[in-house]
């Protein structure tokens, strides 16, 4: 953010917080290019960095200044009068630059909030594994949980409208509408994997989608925090940011005439917890199923009336935590009783007491993981290892390095499993698939190839943590056994591996 704060101070005084003029500045595209070189593993490099040049950007800006050529050609699929023969490249450059521009208000707000709260900038706060200690602390005391799939907006205009609270510049919003109308079918968001997360413009659409989710969560969490005060009072929600909330004395129907078709009564639940990752969230509560059903139907009406997004109640599943497990972030988590026997002695009498405590159990999803490995041809659907034929043309070191990297990533991510037996089975599949791939390359049998290499090949699959612990402690020590049995949550995991995401 510091790299363009100087530019922002200049344009604030001249343009009254307008972001639109920045689209004509070359340094914006230079920033987008530099960020593309250092982008996270979530965003794949699709060739924009190789094709981008200062000459192309200058040509693009000069064409944007020529307003006579700013024409919409809906029927032309690959070229138009504005972009000529480089429509795909120009559209990608504009989307990258526009994403940087629209991120400016969010970045400024983030910097100011970090200064106010004196929060230390740390990647540990972004770790996915930090969610599971929260589960261990809160969920054993709760009774019910609902899996909530956040619906995708049907129309791109919904995504544009969510930006109007942060982007005060109408010209920027109109430019975004024009860009989306020119290059995307407004009605294709029903199949989000093909449109909203297209690799060529993933940064822009992630920004739009995250702003939509942020808008939804800001209202939801506000209601959750205020629900304790609304036990006996009918209250209306005004979804404009200026008058966000007020208590009312007149009937609720008058307030909800535009947003809700019926009276909405709030309810008290001080033990409700909310967790989300990407488009899936979990709403857990200690109260009765009736209360969870109220939240369920409230969310459905909320999406339909405020965001104009159609959602069915069947998309929200309510389960009892003690009887059902929930799938979140690649783990199958459940609450099970942990009974410990305590011996108590009073004078001459002694007796045993069973102390039952609830504990979070995080299991490795063996069946979905075998399905993921079968999709990428590491094994068959039964879990029997097979050779990776597409890698047989690579060098031996490259083949081994690929398998070791996949096994290490899975071991690192699933280090929090309560039972490691299923994880060891997956590592065995990867080891044997690696050996079969090498044997196929050298036109040999697996047994002959293993005899030639010896146990050194299998030692490559031990993670760095396992190697360090095996050197520090003997294999029979209790510390090493606790390492293999216990759960470890790492604070450096920022995204889910493709094999972990089974959907």
From Swiss-Prot:
One of its GO terms (biological process) is tRNA processing. One of its GO terms (cellular component) is chloroplast. It holds the Pfam family Intron_maturas2. One of its GO terms (molecular function) is RNA binding. It is found in: Plastid, Chloroplast. The keyword Nucleus does not apply. Keywords: Chloroplast, mRNA processing, Plastid, RNA-binding, tRNA processing. It comes from the Eukaryota. Its main location: plastid. PANTHER family: MATURASE K. Usually encoded in the trnK tRNA gene intron. Probably assists in splicing its own and other chloroplast group II introns. Belongs to the intron maturase 2 family. MatK subfamily. This is Maturase K.
